[in-house]
Amino acid sequence: MSDHNEAVRVRISGRVQGVGFRMWTRDEALRLGVTGWVRNEADGSVSALIAGADSAISAMIERLRRGPAGASVSGVETEVAQLENMPRDFRITG
């Protein structure tokens, strides 16, 4: 895995549950070499924690803005996260 230079928490809103968004996110994360997790939230949004090289995180956020076929992303919020206790892979956690 790549060295973690940055970590970002992301919340994606819109039609993002029931459309394969988490599996698609995991696949895109693996392609880009970022680590972290993705999960569904009770309010219908999807949350993710993404860590890796700055350029890979930027590319991942751009992909999250588009989402997979069948999704309709209406918003993406990001905030810087701590690099402590980061996963070494990318997981679907809920």
UniProtKB/Swiss-Prot annotation:
The EC number(s) this enzyme carries: 3.6.1.7
Protein name: Acylphosphatase
Family annotation (PROSITE patterns): ACYLPHOSPHATASE_1 (PS00150), ACYLPHOSPHATASE_2 (PS00151), ACYLPHOSPHATASE_3 (PS51160)
Acylphosphatase-like domain ranges (all copies): 7-94
Record keywords, A-Z: Hydrolase
Origin: domain of life: Bacteria
Protein family per UniProt: Belongs to the acylphosphatase family.
Organism: Rhizobium etli (strain ATCC 51251 / DSM 11541 / JCM 21823 / NBRC 15573 / CFN 42)
Disulfide bonds: none
PANTHER family (UniProt xref): ACYLPHOSPHATASE
Catalytic-site annotation from UniProt: R22, N40
